[in-house]
């Protein structure tokens, strides 16, 4: 009997109650990181998330000094051993009350779209490798949601990145062989928010407007001019649109983008330093090998045994190439900031071009 072909995940369907729980938890602990577990089921490639619960955070006492303590316990909570036991116990209790008790991933909060980091990568790698391969990471950004639209996204690690991360192959040669780019780290899945039929019908009842009373026909011109509708015009000037104040969200994103670009420059400088060190050592090895060959040629004429030519491996030590993983994650984060700025910059740039003549009168004169 042939095995049933596995359908790849194509979308994520989240219950509205789960969304409200995630928003509440992330808003309560903002701006610190909030993490939790999500449960549900996989239905023909659509991951249906029906329940969630937060992870407890074990605070390290201030008087204790552990060298291996995580700098952010909440961010590392999904893969903590204590929380793994806690999650299994919670899922067992949910199963006893006939609730969907399949582990389908975890959720985390982000600030200004800053979620592409090692904690998120390690947590999702742990879930896809140890828990369940068909798991997702939900990322909720309270700062972005405060702008008026819900920011809830679902991500998975690509199979290509999973293989490279498992073997820790992030050198330049390995990345060229596997053709792994920073765009291949995360795979985003579309998110759909689902309501029950009862809630949907209730929302439609709330949206039902009151019946409008028939308008009275004005009897004279004076009555028409005194009407409150005559004093309101759609074409009235709105001077608020001329305000040149930049959105604080956009300003903060620009600052974070500059910080990420500076980090990228630092990573590039470190890699260039490695290349220079490698070139110096290789030049020393080449000079040593040439000298040893000349010595062996002289010894051959004197009918003496040759000296070993592989002794340079003991005398010289080539520098180890730094991992390119941090640089890849930072590049992916730069792309994330650039997309966010691109979505907010349209209204501001229009105002800047409108006042360009007053700011730079010399260009207008030319």
From Swiss-Prot:
Component of the eukaryotic translation initiation factor 3 (eIF-3) complex. It is found in: Cytoplasm. One of its GO terms (biological process) is formation of cytoplasmic translation initiation complex. Component of the eukaryotic translation initiation factor 3 (eIF-3) complex, which is involved in protein synthesis of a specialized repertoire of mRNAs and, together with other initiation factors, stimulates binding of mRNA and methionyl-tRNAi to the 40S ribosome. The eIF-3 complex specifically targets and initiates translation of a subset of mRNAs involved in cell proliferation. Residues 12-161 form the MPN domain. It comes from Emericella nidulans (strain FGSC A4 / ATCC 38163 / CBS 112.46 / NRRL 194 / M139). GO terms for cellular component: eukaryotic 43S preinitiation complex; eukaryotic 48S preinitiation complex; eukaryotic translation initiation factor 3 complex. Keywords: Cytoplasm, Initiation factor, Protein biosynthesis. The keyword Protein biosynthesis applies. It holds the Pfam family JAB. HAMAP family: eIF3h (MF_03007). GO terms for molecular function: metallopeptidase activity; translation initiation factor activity. This is Eukaryotic translation initiation factor 3 subunit H. The keyword Cytoplasm applies. Belongs to the eIF-3 subunit H family. SMART domains: JAB_MPN.
């Amino acid at each position: 009997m042939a095995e049933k072909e596995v359908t790849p995940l194509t979308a994520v369907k989240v219950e509205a109650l789960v969304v409200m729980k995630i928003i509440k938890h992330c808003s309560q602990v903002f701006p610190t990181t909030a993490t939790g577990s999500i449960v549900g089921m996989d239905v023909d490639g659509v991951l249906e998330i029906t329940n969630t619960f937060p992870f407890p955070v074990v605070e390290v006492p201030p008087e204790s000094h552990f060298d291996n303590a995580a700098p952010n316990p909440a961010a590392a909570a999904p893969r903590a051993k204590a929380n793994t036991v806690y999650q299994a116990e919670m899922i067992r209790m949910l199963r006893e009350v006939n609730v969907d008790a399949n582990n389908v991933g975890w959720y985390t909060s982000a600030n200004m779209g800053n979620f592409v980091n090692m904690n998120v990568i390690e947590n999702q790698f742990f879930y896809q490798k140890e828990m369940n391969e068909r798991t997702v990471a939900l990322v909720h950004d309270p700062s972005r949601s405060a702008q008026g639209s819900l920011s809830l996204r679902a991500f998975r690690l690509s199979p290509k990145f999973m293989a490279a991360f498992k073997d820790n192959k992030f050198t330049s040669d390995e990345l060229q062989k596997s053709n792994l780019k920073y765009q291949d780290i995360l795979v985003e899945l579309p998110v759909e928010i689902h309501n029950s039929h009862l809630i949907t019908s209730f929302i439609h009842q709330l949206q039902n407007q009151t019946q409008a009373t028939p308008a009275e026909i004005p009897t004279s011109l004076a009555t028409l001019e005194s009407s409150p509708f005559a004093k309101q015009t759609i074409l009235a000037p709105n001077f608020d649109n001329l305000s040149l104040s930049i959105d604080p969200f956009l300003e903060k994103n620009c600052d974070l983008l500059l910080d990420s670009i500076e980090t990228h420059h630092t990573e590039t400088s470190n890699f260039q330093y490695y290349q220079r060190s490698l070139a110096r050592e290789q030049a020393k090895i080449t000079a040593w090998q040439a000298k040893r060959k000349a010595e062996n040629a002289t010894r051959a004429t004197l009918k003496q045994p040759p000296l070993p030519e592989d002794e340079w491996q003991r005398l010289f030590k080539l520098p180890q190439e730094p991992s390119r993983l941090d640089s890849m994650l930072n590049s992916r984060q730069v792309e994330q900031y650039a997309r966010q700025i691109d979505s907010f910059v349209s209204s501001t740039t229009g105002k800047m071009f409108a006042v360009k003549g007053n700011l730079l009168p010399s260009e207008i004169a030319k």
